[in-house]
Structure formats: structure tokens, C-alpha cells
UniProtKB/Swiss-Prot annotation:
Chain ranges on the Cytoplasmic side, renumbered to this chain: 1-5, 111-121, 177-220
GO CC field: cell division site; growing cell tip; plasma membrane
InterPro entries found in the cross-reference section: pH-response_reg_palI/RIM9 (IPR051380), SUR7/Rim9-like_fungi (IPR009571)
Membrane topology annotation: Multi-pass membrane protein
Claim: Membrane is one of the keywords in the record: yes
Function (record text): Required for the proteolytic cleavage of the transcription factor RIM101 in response to alkaline ambient pH.
Transmembrane segments: 6-26, 90-110, 122-142, 156-176
Subcellular location: Cell membrane
UniProt keyword annotations, A-Z: Cell membrane, Membrane, Transmembrane, Transmembrane helix
Topological domain ranges for the Extracellular compartment: 27-89, 143-155
Pfam families found in the cross-reference section: SUR7 (PF06687)
The keyword Magnesium is annotated on this UniProt entry: no
Protein name, as recorded: pH-response regulator palI/RIM9 homolog 1
Length: 220
């Protein structure tokens, strides 16, 4: 069981770190970005020029007005202009990070109080792992939808994060099964019930058998 816990927590910790890489992308940090295209780096909360000289304000979604404020001769280009409105869907990255963080906190609580954790809490954690997996996978699909072949390794980490979340959910199901067996063995040890292998006979019948055996011994 200790090996299951180690792999369980390690998988979720890696998923949390990978989600963090996408969440703190440009313009929060200059080295992490989900796409690079036409001299610009794009992140969840905005964009920056490759040289870092100009960055957009930190907000959800991209806008042509950001560039026009700095230089009327430059325009912000995405792979497809129709995708400016879709840039607000990058909020899914933040939602995915929050979901993984909650799942990670659940994992720590479950591993610390393993034998005393109620079954309803464990089942809720399994359900939450499914939600977290779908949100993480959705974040990766949104990156591909917006930036196509221009996605960077940071976006691919979202797919890896979804894999680790799915692995953690499977391990949690195996741990619940093992916990149910441990509780059954513990309950069986506390309640010692003797079950007869055959149906007990009538007392009068047993007395007759005893008399016959004693009479045979007297004859001998």
C-alpha cells in the first residue's frame, strides 16, 4: 500500500507542477508560453513580443487594441483572426490548475488518514478525478484549437498532466479496493463468530447414541 501512496502522490504532484507552468505563462513570466507565432509569445493571461520589449496587460483574452496602443504600424496576429474571441477560453487553464490543486489536497488528506477515511469521501475523490481529467484535457484541446501547430512544449504538458490525473484516479480506485479488504479483515478479527459445519442434532438423539456406545463398552 505504501508504494501505491507514493506513486499516487507523485503523479498528482507532477500534474500540479505542469498545470502551474501553463498558468504562470507570459506576461506573468517571460520564459513560459503556450505558443510562439509571428514574433509574439502567447500565454494564458496575455502576450509579449519575443524580445520582451512589449507585453499586454494581464487579463483574460487577447485584443488588437493592445498593439495599437503601442505602435499603430504593428498588429497582433494569431494563426487565425477569428480566434480572438476564443482566447477567453484560456480561462480553462486556471480552472484546470484549481481542480488539480483540490485533488492534490484531497490526496494528502486521504494518505494521512487512510484507514479512517469514509467511503463517501473516497468516492467523491474518484468523481473529482474524472472532472479534473476532463478539464485538463479540455485545456490542451483549446490550445490546439487556437494555435494549431504553433503550440510549444508548455501546452503538451497539459496532455501529460491529464495522463497523470487519470493514472491517479486509477490508483485511487485500487487503493479503495484494498482499503475495503483491510476493513473486512479487521472486522472479522474483532468479531469472532463460530459457525457449525453441520446442522446440530436433537439432544434426545445424542443421548440415545451415547447410551448405545456406553452399553457396548459394558458388554466388552
Amino acid at each position: 500500500m505504501s508504494h501505491f501512496k507514493i506513486v499516487f502522490l507523485t503523479s498528482l504532484s507532477l500534474a500540479l507542477v505542469f498545470e502551474l507552468f501553463n498558468t504562470i505563462s507570459v506576461p506573468i513570466t517571460s520564459h513560459l508560453f503556450i505558443s510562439e507565432y509571428n514574433g509574439y509569445k502567447f500565454g494564458v493571461f496575455g502576450w509579449c513580443k519575443v524580445d520582451g520589449s512589449i507585453c499586454s496587460p494581464i487579463r483574460m483574452g487577447y485584443s488588437l487594441d493592445d498593439i495599437l496602443l503601442f505602435n499603430d504600424n504593428e498588429y497582433l496576429h494569431l494563426p487565425n483572426h477569428a480566434k480572438y474571441a476564443l482566447s477567453k477560453l484560456l480561462l480553462v487553464h486556471v480552472l484546470s490548475f484549481v481542480c488539480v490543486l483540490v485533488f492534490w489536497l484531497f490526496a494528502i488528506l486521504i494518505c494521512i488518514k487512510w484507514l479512517n477515511t469514509s467511503k463517501s469521501v473516497l468516492l467523491f475523490a474518484v468523481g473529482w478525478s474524472m472532472v479534473t481529467f476532463m478539464v485538463s484535457l479540455l485545456g490542451f484541446l483549446i490550445d490546439v484549437l487556437m494555435f494549431a501547430s504553433h503550440v510549444t512544449w508548455s501546452s503538451w504538458l497539459m496532455l501529460v498532466s491529464a495522463f497523470f490525473v487519470a493514472l491517479s484516479g486509477i490508483l485511487l480506485c485500487l487503493m479503495i479496493r484494498d482499503l475495503s479488504y483491510r476493513r473486512f479483515v479487521k472486522l472479522q478479527g474483532e468479531v469472532d463468530v463460530c459457525v457449525p459445519m453441520t446442522e446440530p442434532r436433537d439432544p434426545d438423539e445424542l443421548n440415545e447414541i451415547w447410551k448405545k456406545k456406553t452399553s457396548k463398552r459394558e458388554i466388552l
